[in-house]
């Protein structure tokens, strides 16, 4: 069987559907199949440690009976005996499951589906291990630097992903998409024997858009710039967020907080803020699933509902939440196409598509030049408390700003602020933007935030 052939899955789905239709206790059913072709090279200490090609495929079945009782089962075997087993097991699990009066319906076919472009690249599909070894040479070349890395690791992956959806309401959707990812992690040792780490990565839907030389250079530059770190005095400083920091400190927390499941369960700091001002009027954030060639571009979500562009934050006002069919049904509204599944064995969740933050009018370098003393915040590995919005974390990569210039790297500096306060303290947004994975984001200046140092 060709695991990327829609006709093969249509045949399997129709076979299962005929079996399910015989059982009157089954009111709804959904079949979700996923196929993956992956080619990966992992390297450590500058040498290839592991390399593999693999293909995998599987199918998940959800059956829902009276009063929302649901059974879920799955298989990676498409034989007749395996199909009979998942139908049998799904019915058994449905019978013994808890009633769910909040379930209203599975997704229904949308009136219109937008065609999307450039989500599949045959160059990625045809990559071999030898091709990849050549592509990642710029990372290995870092060992030739005057100050060579003390350690060097990372990986390169190419993925082709097929999804096939079929349900009892008439949903019949499929797609095939591709992406590549490369990352580089290294450390350098300063003259006092203290390490400084650097990292960079890039993920793209098309091989031609991948710039491994830039990834290698950025990881080395970060580590080199971090040598001979300094401590800063505790206090309030103006903060200039890099696009990387904006993506992970501002945009990503919002995308998680507008998940309607979290909202309905009172597990989001934005639960009470719909149609209310949550940030500066200069701040707008959109979700656009139809941008050609981007990582999260898709015509439909993982339930088969049509996707559409939405404005999450409009001039500082919280405008919309993300919904799947279940959470939308609880509120008596239509889903806006944000159902997600990480795997054919996983439950239906909610996630974002492509996130677009608005641009400003000033160059980021002009914004920097206007800061007498402040902090350039590039990256933290910490996450906020999504219930309260409080954030207190280590600035893993950050620098002191002095007289409008980025100078020394920071050591053991912590940033503390509530995210709602951070949104309201947005003072300036740059006119330049960069893609960080699926987010298109600018530089952002916050008027102030508390920085805790060791001095």
What is the meaning of each model-derived region?
Residues 1-298, 302-305, 314-317, 405, ...:
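Active-site bordering "gate/hinge" segments
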Residues 273-455:
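Dual-mode signal for accessory low-complexity, basic/Gly-rich regions
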